[in-house]
Amino acid sequence: MAEKFTQHTGLVVPLDAANVDTDAIIPKQFLQKVTRTGFGAHLFNDWRFLDDKGQQPNPEFVLNYPEYQGASILLARENFGCGSSREHAPWALTDYGFKVVIAPSFADIFYGNSFNNQLLPVTLSDEQVDELFKLVQANPGITFEVDLEAQVVKAGDKTYSFKIDDFRRHCMLNGLDSIGLTLQHEAAISDYERKLPAFMN
């Protein structure tokens, strides 16, 4: 079972860039591991650090600003997560501490991978995202509330509705990944296997 996602209130960091690809999110030299942990240290490595080893923070990159330390909601521009289909991208984002990414659009594979890893991708219109960027930039350190049950983002004095597939919403609300979904039908699977002819077992 994965962690259930119903509602999250968190600090918002504005990444004012479109077409952020998966190689920028987690560069290929850090993909040797097959476990989900440890990737957060290398999130946006080529942007966050001035050296290849990740020891000299880039003071001009937004994630390194003092006011955004501990951010758990990432605000981005269109086509977030484009490029190769590596699942390491949502792994890196969640391992860093992000729970939500808000953008006008997402690459399809990244969008699906995010749900599989309990990272909520929230799609709002370009105009709404523009409003949110202005709000965050005028109020560094602001928090948003993201309510998956009600399907709304509460930011300042405004509330923004977002759409999400019913099945994906159900899975996130109940903390169900592919393994959890399978285990829901464990009894039926066992019953089916018992009925198989012996030579098929």
Swiss-Prot record:
Pathway: Amino-acid biosynthesis; L-leucine biosynthesis; L-leucine from 3-methyl-2-oxobutanoate: step 2/4. It is an enzyme of class 4 (lyase). It comes from the Bacteria. Pfam families: Aconitase_C. GO terms for molecular function: 3-isopropylmalate dehydratase activity. It catalyses: (2R,3S)-3-isopropylmalate = (2S)-2-isopropylmalate. Its EC number is 4.2.1.33. Heterodimer of LeuC and LeuD. This is 3-isopropylmalate dehydratase small subunit.
